[in-house]
Amino acid sequence: MAENTELRRELWILGIKPGEGREDLLSSYLESGGYVCRLGQCENLESGRPLGIVLDISPFSEDGWGILLKIKSSPKTCNIPVLPVFLSVNGKIGGVFPVAGFFTLPVDEEYLQDRLAVYGLTEEAETWDLQSMVVSRSGEEKLSKAIERLGFDVIKGYTGKEALALASIHPVYMIFCAQMLPDMSAFELQERLRLDPYSSNTPLFVLLKDSMKDGERLALSRDVAHLVRKKQLSCEEFLGYLRRKE
């Protein structure tokens, strides 16, 4: 057992202030699934290099959105997988948001190509005519051109409702979506896409602005709170999300 533990890097829990104990239930769920985990700090990520991060982005977190932006803005930590979760003030797990990944704007084209190759999402573009969707108020022309150079056709949506309508007509291979759209967040768009059997497994990548004001981070946390459907997920429900993320 000790040997296996050494071979597997840890999952870190971030966004929780040490001493609060809000991570206790989450830790017990992870440990019951066979994962090694601990409460970590953002400043230790470069040296610690965890296998992945479970990040609290609720209104009760310790600047969860700020931590996410720091992780994804640094070349030394941006490729560490992050699973955002909603933890109540008492640490109950109310929601999990297993998006495929995050990119900060403006997206570096070489990094985009590398990450999509790691996810195995570029190979079939050489053989098949595949469509990707970019959902953003601005249209993200530079990103769209980079995706086209990887061999994908690009269709654009400017609101969440438009993206849902387009996805029902044109099945897409993957989606890039701004974190906040005029009518919904990227997480809400993903929740709605999962209700449609034709788009339930479509990878969705979230596009983060390169900086966020305090008010923006608070608004994002409150928006996530509206997506919470249960007071507490069971251990099996939570681990199911985590396994799909792997």
PLM ranges: what are they?
Residues 1-51, 75, 108-141, 161, ...:
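Non-catalytic signal-transmission and effector/linker regions of two-component phosphorelay proteins
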Residues 15-17, 55, 86, 134-137, ...:
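Short beta-strand/turn micro-motifs composed of small residues
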Residues 23, 41-90, 177-195, 200-201, ...:
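Conserved phosphotransfer microenvironments
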Residues 31, 147-148:
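Alpha-helical segments within the soluble intracellular
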Residues 50-52, 100, 172-174, 225:
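Conserved acidic residues
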Residues 78-112:
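Helix-enriched interaction subdomains in cytosolic or periplasmic regions
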Residues 94-103, 186, 216-229:
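As written
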Residues 147, 153-163, 176:
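Eukaryotic modular interaction domains in large regulatory/scaffold proteins
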